[in-house]
Amino acid sequence: MRGFPAALSLSSWLLVAYFNHYDQQVGAPVPGWNGARMPERTTLAGRYCTLEPLNADAHAAALLAAYQDAPDDRDWTWLASDRPDTLAQCHEWVAQKVMDPSLVPFAVMDNARGEAVGLVCFMRIDKANGVLEIGHVTWSPRMKNRVTGTEALWLLMRDAFEHGFRRVEWKCDSMNTASRRAAERLGFTYEGRLRQMMVRKGRNRDSEWFSLLDSEWPQADAALRAWLSPENFTADGIQKQPLSHFRARSPA
């Protein structure tokens, strides 16, 4: 097939085959593709949280306090870094991310608290092919089981697709079941395991790989917007319906 019927649904599009003049099967055309635009280190405002460009002087102290709320460092087992124990360590750790030109790093600001409670980055940014990864996800106990974590990731995904990216990636240690559940909950598709991808803290790490495509974003976005709506939460901040409820209702 040499054309692309615009009326086809995503499921139908996946069944379309394209062939060149040698009768070889080729990929679908991407008309007018000129690459994605680089995400900026700029503020992304939400109802429950705000993503601010990461700044060691502005955010390190609050992040240290938030991370130290945990009684131990088990949340850091599968992360690249160890939990900072002092302000100097936290400042240096944050500054390294800020100075890394391959990252677009953000502090997650809890709007109710007015202070940083976690951080997250865009990484592995490939503008030419329209691919980037959400990584360095480092939530504190002040974000766990709260709406801020989901909204922060929705803000990032929305920003990526608004900048013209075709694919947003998520990867995690194969042992990190919480990260895997988070990706699947948000609508990412599991693509497989990359065996012996790296050595992390002296141990082998296999990585689980997930992606969300621009064609899948409208459905995921609709579900996330519905879940994040104030009408879905009690006065105490308890969800009335899980995100899976809205994902099941979103049109394909």
Give the positions of each predicted feature:
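Serine residues within intrinsically disordered or low-complexity segments
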Residues: 9-12
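Conserved GNAT acetyl-CoA-binding A-motif
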Residues: 162-171
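Conserved catalytic-core motifs of GNAT/GCN5-like acyltransferases
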Residues: 189-203
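Conserved active-site tyrosine of GNAT-family acetyltransferases
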Residues: 182-183, 210
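Conserved beta-strand-loop-alpha-helix junction that forms the acyl-donor binding cleft
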Residues: 170-180
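Conserved acetyl-CoA-binding loop-helix of GNAT-fold acetyltransferases
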Residues: 145-158, 181
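GNAT-family acyltransferases
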Residues: 14-146, 159-163, 203-252
